[in-house]
């Protein structure tokens, strides 16, 4: 059964029983609000969109168009419902595809691209493979940001720390020949506190990049 909730006056349905993390990633609340501030008049691509949290925030901020890409039909159906109940003026389109094939083969550039993948590594033994995956998706994302546009990119892998993530994004930019500048460094919100005795609790990290 779906439950309707609200975040910053945006209405949305969540599946608290079957959805991931009780149906909505509340740890991205502040970061969605940040995207909203930059979205007015922009074209936005939200990859690994799930039920459309970042897409809804972009539309609420006045984005002209938003494309949500995810591999789950159920998540995309819910995203479409969430867009519908808010009656946004911007255009929204959902695409059921795996992220990497879509990013590698897309022929359209966007003002803003959001990359919010699942955790690519849950153990240190998988960290090297995860870093390669982060680099690859960010290379693909950076290729498709319009000059002067922005990339919102995240990692929720606890074993990939802030410096490793930063170094990986820098390598991706160098490989595809894009000049980037850091506008914001993002993390989980205050209701997901990090104990000084357990720094590993700081699992969510992100960057907002200006791309030239």
Predicted regions mapped to residue ranges:
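Non-catalytic substrate-recognition/targeting regions of SAM-dependent transferases
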Residues: 1-25, 33
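Conserved class I S-adenosyl-L-methionine
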Residues: 41-50
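Conserved SAM-binding loop of SAM-dependent methyltransferases across substrates and taxa
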Residues: 51-64
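Conserved SAM-binding motif I beta-strand of class I
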Residues: 65-70
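S-adenosyl-L-methionine
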Residues: 74-114, 120
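Helix-to-beta-strand junctions that scaffold the AdoMet/dcAdoMet cofactor pocket
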Residues: 88, 145-147
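Mobile active-site "lid"/loop adjacent to the S-adenosyl-L-methionine
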Residues: 96, 110-140
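C-terminal catalytic and target-recognition region of SAM-dependent MTase-like enzymes
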Residues: 150-212
